[in-house]
Amino acid sequence: MKDLLKFLKQQSKTEEFNGIKIGLASPDLIRSWSFGEVKKPETINYRTFKPEREGLFCARIFGPVKDYECLCGKYKRLKHRGVICEKCGVEVTQTKVRRERMGHIDLASPVAHIWFLKSLPSRIGLMLDMTLRDIERVLYFESFVVIEPGMTSLERGQMLTEESYLDALEEYGDEFEAKMGAEAVLELLRAIELEKEIESLREELPSINSETRRKKMTKRLKLIEAFFHSGNKPEWMILKVLPVLPPDLRPLVPLDGGRFATSDLNDLYRRVINRNNRLKRLLDLAAPDIIVRNEKRMLQESVDALLDNGRRGRAITGSNKRPLKSLADMIKGKQGRFRQNLLGKRVDYSGRSVITVGPTLRLHQCGLPKKMALELFKPFIYGKLEGRGLATTIKAAKKMVEREVPEVWDVLDDVIREHPVMLNRAPTLHRLGIQAFEPVLIEGKAIQLHPLVCAAYNADFDGDQMAVHVPLTLEAQLEARSLMMSTNNILSPANGEPVITPSQDVVLGLYYASRKCVNGKGEGMVFESIDEVEKAYRTGFAAIHAQVKVRITETHIAENGERTEARRIVDTTVGRSLLSRVLPKGLSFDLVNQNMGKKQIGKLLNTCYRQLGLKDTVVFADQLMYAGFHYATVSGASVGIDDMVIPAAKYTLVADAEAEVLEIQEQFQSGLVTAGERYNKVIDIWASANEKISKAMMDNLSVETVINRDGEEEEQESFNSIYMMADSGARGSAAQIRQLAGMRGLMAKPDGSIIETPIVANFREGLNVSQYFISTHGARKGLADTALKTANSGYLTRRLVDVAQDLVVIEDDCGTFEGLTMKPLIEGGDVVEPLRERVLGRVVALDVFYPGTEKVLAPRNTLLDEAWCDTLEDNSIDEVIVRSVISCNTDFGVCKACYGRDLARGHIINQGEAIGVVAAQSIGEPGTQLNGWRTFHIGGAASRASAENNVQVKNAGTVKLHNAKHVTNSEGKLVIVSRSSEVAIIDELGREKERYKVPYGTILEKLEESIVTAGEIIANWDPHTHPIISEVAGTIKFVDMIEGVTMTRQTDDLTGLSSIVVMEVGQRPTAGKEMRPSIRLLDASGEDLKIPGTEVPAQYFLPGKAIVNQDDNAEINVGDALARIPQESSKTRDITGGLPRVADLFEARKPKEPAILAEYSGTISFGKETKGKRRLLITPADGGKPYEEMIPKWRNLNVFEGEKVERGEVIADGAEAAHDILRLRGIHKVANYIVNEVQDVYRLQGVKINDKHIEVIIRQMLRKCLITDAGDSQFLAGEQAEVARVKIANRELEAQGKKPATFDRELLGITKASLATESFISAASFQETTRVLTEAAVGGKSDKLRGLKENVIVGRLIPAGTGYAYHQKRNAALAAKASGKTSEQATTITASEAERNLADLLNLAGSSD
């Protein structure tokens, strides 16, 4: 009966709420929660262990200490339930009420709540429009504040020191009222009339000009409105009554030896009660003011410490010098309530153990130790034993299991059959870190794991442990089987490729089996079937590598599923024909008729999955694995010291390098090269020596000479074990073999600089002491980096999950026509990512036409699968507009069409899929593989960048220019006169093959649309200077060019040529400060020439340091350089790479020296210069007001006076800031920028992540906007709001014919975006808990529980996956209820009524016994 009651209570609790509201508690509300006032600081009586009356653990207030038993023992047993004992005043009920009953303390003097005071921005300060310092001075009794000025010259809220207060008293008597302490603040807050205040602020706002004041007013207005709408009263921020936490939540536990362990809260409460009681006594005694004040201040401090210890002043410490844990500390941080207990719970029916290999398991199985299974499945076993009649009671069943009688094992087998268990390995970085398997009982104590799932778990068998969880309910078992079974998780959610590819031993075995060798036993034999081959191999007539001819039978599966068989004879080897036995029907023999390296096996599995589906692939993967292990064993491949063959050429190469180094050293000593050059040269010499040695070594290792059938020598690929391991991709790489048999090479110091003497020895020769010592540097740095990297990567993942957790697919199609334009990614001469990889699995947003026609090739809303991608490639389409989550119109979610294919399943995504979390995991999981700090070991990268001075094409094709302005010079070549121009090479099908950026002043050797051949150089430029190109031909006229004032003449000693150098403003004499040196171009009659197509005279202004090679009155042609500006570039900017770069992008951090972009389209001119800055003016083409910007002088400008720029063009080079791109070029450009930049980092490490995942995060970064004009909406101009909210409001306004609000999208970093979510529960559990909760409470916010995190925290199914349907049903029911409220009312019965009825029944039952 009791359980039934519990059940009823529970039911009513979980179902009845749809949101959680947080607000301020009024004193009356606190009293209404309370079951009595706590008056004494005592806890329990140390002799009797009974709680003291009216103390912190009082049984009268909080409830009985033992179930159904009052304190004095007069009433015991269930039948007295609900009686209040007249002797001790304790209600007879369950002890559990001590966990929920609260008490209260009536404070003798009001106290400010520290959260609303000190949590910035201070809410009390904002409300009273006073500074925090002033309020603190009032609260802590340092000065008075005027409350009622009366008929005096004082103002309300004015601060008075002790002296000035006394003066005022003398002057005005009791005309006015001034107080100090929290009472004063309370009165000030009480005096605020919210409605009037709102009206006056709204009237005042438009007339304020100062930006800072307007911001402050808007903040204050928002706060007061929040108070007004939420029904909170400002004076509730001051506490008059302090609630007391139920005692079982701050327990006092007796330890052995008569001591007690207590929660810190008890100490904190004790201090408050002590001080409060002392203050009451002092007030009764009418003690002197100064004593009372001191006591009030101490009370305020003790309440501060209870609520949030350490926020103000020094933290109160306990006996052991550590700060006490206050209420705020209980909920925040990793160990706080949110993250420790609500988001991460420990679960029952779980166990953990070490893992070992289970090479004989099938893919869906795992080996579970019998001991563990017995413990995990106990309840099921008890049930079965009873059901079969082997045990009469549960107790008997328990005994049987403890004795481990034989029948128990039979029952266990029965229980386990078809009952999946879940295996998890920490850290669970992505969803493949938990998978379900069918258990197979094994002896021993270690869990056996299938080798193929190791990659997904990132598990190895060097002592890793794993946890087992048992899904109990039928639904849970069903979900585990259909969604989490390892066989259903073959593809990786990050990139859609198989994640169960074989590695290591399996690869080595398959590679060994598929190799061929010359003159193997049985070479040249012909077999009529694969059975015959096997017979010959087994009887020893043919060796596994022998080259033979075999007749094979292949099955072809047509589009419609028809199967046809075909036979043919192939040249192959014995091993390959044996491997083809495990090949499923429908795959071509050619897939195994090659050396099976890791790449080939991966491709084989992928092909199998795409052509034959899931089931066949799973079976095939298992068979491949068994075969691989078998042949690896047979091969006898091992690592021996003689396998590391040192090339003979090594010693001569090392000697040569040493000689070269000596030569450089001599040059340096005779002063021919600088120290830096010497260092770089030496490092280059050793690097190239290392390359040569390793090439010699690999050439040596990779082939061996054998005698063929005809008795002649022949070279064949080597069977050296080490070479085979590296070549197959099983383990090791050329770089590692180089260290074994070549030379170790150059080593880096811990700070990253390269030590110039390399280690010439290798591991086979062994290192000497100094070499070994140098080696240890790198090793230790590697370990330290890894540890830091793991922490950083984990934190990035956490932020990503938090920002994206509430993004779920919630509708089929939002109907948008927008999308992202996808083109192949081309960098220089390489296609980095072809179009098919970018659009595979996406939905077309706008019809794709056959090139050059109006005929539709792929209609809108087509999901592009592999077949469609082939079609696009065949028709050489190189641009498709696809749907993207960034442009999806769904509010609070996305639609299926904008997301496209679910990568882990290979079909279009389902509703309810939690794409946000999947995206965050996919980006965060490879984080540990990214390198910690900066990429690119400077050396290779730096030297290449400096030499870029031409474009050499790799493929033949046609030249095409992108956004390039150009003029033709006297030689008939094109000269580029625009920024950010690109030249591309197009093949005969119109597909772009290469694309290069070319700077201003590039001379093109080829005209547009001309044909080039591979290897031709098509563009040249000077990388070290920035030319100023003349766009007209004419005569040069110098303006403001005065020798010694604005310029100097310099003559080159070697060549004898003189040139003019413009002086920098700072170095000019006073006369030259205001002058603007420039070159004008005149025509033959001495008139100003105009720049073609405009009315602007051709006048070129020269910045400081410009070198002019022409003289006054010289003739000049179009496209010639008037002057050159030396570039102080190629200061190798440290390229941030790896994790920090990804984090910077997602946090949308501003780079140190951002590129300056043009805010408007128009014409450039320069205004008056200040000390360190230039004034840049942009005059719009329509003649509007010029926009001006101050730019530091040291920035290299890309533009000249009179040049036209488009909005968003780069004016000064630098790293582009994402915010600027969004503001000036729009949402699609910023999305492309972030996606490409993030992908660059991952691509460098060879990690594949689908663009979709990054787009999902970007959508979350863009979900806020800034209201520019409120229209008729309830928003304020300048307010930050959720885009979806604004859109919904605008739709309503438009429907009513009112003016909608206008807004600008805003890009927030992921941390900011997480904290700015609508759900305060989610934000509070992420970071800055105090600030989030304070803000939410003041605004009386209500959490609609829309995201996943909030629902986990309140203990519900999440609104995604299988919980999605449950939430949809609930919402439908709620909607129905809202529309048809009245009808149902009569029949329902509330839980409390049911409880009363049950109580009566129980009492009847109780009294009858």
From Swiss-Prot:
GO terms for molecular function: DNA binding; DNA-directed RNA polymerase activity; magnesium ion binding; zinc ion binding. This is DNA-directed RNA polymerase subunit beta'. Keywords: DNA-directed RNA polymerase, Magnesium, Metal-binding, Nucleotidyltransferase, Transcription, Transferase, Zinc. It catalyses: RNA(n) + a ribonucleoside 5'-triphosphate = RNA(n+1) + diphosphate. The RNAP catalytic core consists of 2 alpha, 1 beta, 1 beta' and 1 omega subunit. When a sigma factor is associated with the core the holoenzyme is formed, which can initiate transcription. The keyword ATP-binding does not apply. GO terms for biological process: DNA-templated transcription. It is an enzyme of class 2 (transferase). The keyword Transferase applies. NCBIfam families: rpoC_TIGR. Zn(2+) 1 binds at C70, C72, C85, C88. Pfam families: RNA_pol_Rpb1_1, RNA_pol_Rpb1_2, RNA_pol_Rpb1_3, RNA_pol_Rpb1_4, RNA_pol_Rpb1_5. One of its GO terms (cellular component) is DNA-directed RNA polymerase complex. Mg(2+) binds at D460, D462, D464. Its EC number is 2.7.7.6. It comes from the Bacteria. CDD domains: RNAP_beta'_C (cd02655), RNAP_beta'_N (cd01609). Coiled coil: none annotated. DNA-dependent RNA polymerase catalyzes the transcription of DNA into RNA using the four ribonucleoside triphosphates as substrates. It comes from Shewanella violacea. Binds 1 Mg(2+) ion per subunit. InterPro entries: DNA-dir_RpoC_beta_prime, DNA-dir_RpoC_beta_prime_bact, RNA_pol_asu, RNA_pol_N, RNA_pol_Rpb1_1, RNA_pol_Rpb1_3, RNA_pol_Rpb1_3_sf, RNA_pol_Rpb1_4. Belongs to the RNA polymerase beta' chain family. Its cofactor is Mg(2+); Zn(2+). Zn(2+) 2 binds at C814, C888, C895, C898. The lineage of its organism: Bacteria, Pseudomonadati, Pseudomonadota, Gammaproteobacteria, Alteromonadales.
